[in-house]
Amino acid sequence: MPLILAGPILRRTESRAVTVWLALKAPRQVELKVYSTAGGTGEIVDRPLLQGTSSTVQLGKYLHVVAVTAAPIDSNILTSGQIYVYDINFAGSRESHSVIGGQENERENLISSLWPATSELSSLGSATISYFNHQLPTFALPPQDLNYLRLVHGSCRKPHGGGRDALSILDNSIAQFAGMANSRPHQLFLTGDQIYGDDVADPMLWALTDAGDTLLGWEENLPLMDEAQIRKNLCTSIPENPAKRNIIREARENSTESQIPKQAAAEYKYKKPVQLKPGTRSDIARDFGGFTAMLVNKPKNAKSHLFSLGEYYAMYLLVWSPVLWCDRFPKGKDICENAKQAKTWDREAAEMASFSGNLWRVRRAIANIPTYTICDDHDVSDDWYLNREWCYRVLGKPLGRRVVQNALLAYAVFQAWGNTPAQFERGKVGDKLLESAANWSKSAGTDDLAWENVAKYLGIPRIDIETGLPKFKLDEDVLILDRDEEVLNWHFTIRSFKHEVIVLDTRTWRGYPTESAIDPPMLLTHKGFEEQIQKPLQETESLNQTGEFEIEATLVVVPTNLVGLWIIDAVQKLDVEQGKVFNSDAGDAWNFHELAFVKL
């Protein structure tokens, strides 16, 4: 197995800073250098302009992650109209010897660390991440003339979604114009779910559980409370409106009973991921986690829901890189209990094979274009934080809270770090999160203080010790999650010479109505509008006035629907009136809350 498990992925890229993300199987000191090219064409590597060094963070026995940022050498900055090259070198860590069998401080470079021996390359595709003979990745900054700006937009990406993985098409687009700075794609915005935590193919979960436990070097204890404990927890009155009817209690009383045998539920308070088999997790996700993806008679939507931290980590590695994929999945008849399940398994395995076959193209593409992502719902689970009832029913259960925290930690490491590397600088909240995550893993999931700190930095709301339910607090006329002040932000702004992109977070900045727990929320609170939209625009105006930028165009990425189709709106309004808010993500669009819609 090569040193690099996933990456390099070119992330936040500006004239004075370039960030590259990697996942390695062993600890390393990682050095990133950005070079000019002769004539700006990308063909011949010239002199280094930016340089940076960073150490990997150990998140598992065989999982070491880094987002290394290169800063200017002397007064060099990057400009438009030029193609730049970057290279990475790895220095052995004091914590372990070189993977390739050399001495402790033997250096490895990017090319030697990407791929295994040639004889093992059959399932990995082309052994290159470059479009040039020098075999190194390249990029170009957005142009000064907006007429030449090339932005690429992608949305959700589900491995077993059917059809070809469209992200692989980007590889052809870059290859066609690789040597033309103003014609090749300049930025990639992936504004949908980069993984699906809920809707997972059975063969994929089979691979993820094994890979996740191996990467961590330990098996997580997933908290499954027995039915009596859950009922007691959920039937506690909601503190904000004690006079109101208890929607959570009513929902619990009206729901179907768990399919899990009572004896087994009472006997096991904790289970390992491997004990929760592919295709069997829908009832567990609903009854022990409170999740809603499988409601409206769609158990298949959560039959292989991710639960463990290792599974969420491994999912990112498998959708971004071909390295950890097996050559072939076992046949359904050898895994499943009946013919129907076996047929589903074999169909999904074929879709997985099709998906993985083009991953080398995806890997090369995202190594050669600055890539930005958002925090969407399926990165955690369907309907994540949709309304107050969702928060109560999921965060009020140990398994639900654990899964949300696992998913958000994985998102922070694999996505947010590259979007906003400044948040992860030494002493910042992201750095504290990584330290806590490393401590949690080193303890094999037993360091409660580390896990509490992870929750704090991720903005997981506090729990009421009397009710076991998440706390809310009043913010002007709406309720917001009672989170710590020192939390990671998922929203960000990226500016170039003539344009900027403002990416909103409409999941964790919601304002929930005080009346009913199922009423549609404001997708951004009043403070959210100020922090995520007004402040960036004010900063841009100031930067334009000082001459540092000349922003002529502003793009805003709004994760949820701005305006829905009238027929969808009609169905969702009926669902809200009937209390069936999880039937159709009712209320997860801007036009459902008039004040927020007008303000936007």
Enumerate the language-model features and the residues they cover.
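Extended recognition/assembly regions associated with phosphoester-bond processing machinery
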Residues: 1-600
